[in-house]
Amino acid sequence: NNIEYFSMLEKWDKKLSKSSVEAGIYVEWQSQLINEMNKKFIPEIAKEYLSMQLFTVIDKISKMNIDERKELLNKTFNSSIDKLKEKFGDRSDNWVYGQKDFKHVKIYHPLEKVVNDSIKEIIALKLYPRGGDGYTPGSTSNSLNQESGGSFRVIIDTGNWDNSFATNSPGQSGDPNSEFYDNLYEDW
């Protein structure tokens, strides 16, 4: 009954783009697969502390007999579609990966939760859509809110210093009134 969504994945470019519905389907399916494999292989006493990595999940799935594998993949795919419908509604065009309630980046100022609203408005950084995950280049973590990643990056041309590039997210200044407070954040 979810064949149309599987067909979308077959035609997908395999990029976890922030504007991709297929990326949203894939990431939710991956999450359901990992959760199901955790239930199956991690002892109850250790579940609070351990989770299987994708590489291990793929390895274990590849070693299953064909019927068990089909059952697992169908079950988790269907549950991923159910979860997406529950969270975002029946229309698949609402399942875009990079959105506020899915994959995004929101850096919180350390004082944001303790200051009044007028100061919070000055220091708070915006939320931006994000693509990728912890298994893609740029390693943006598997959290739906990117909480980690390379925020300081530098390419130095020692033969011509003026030809060097650097970025420091969210910006080069700690002063919220400066134009350089968050000028590098959106591109990060």
Please name every model-derived segment.
Residues 1-188:
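Long, compositionally biased non-active-site segments enriched in small/hydrophobic residues and glycine
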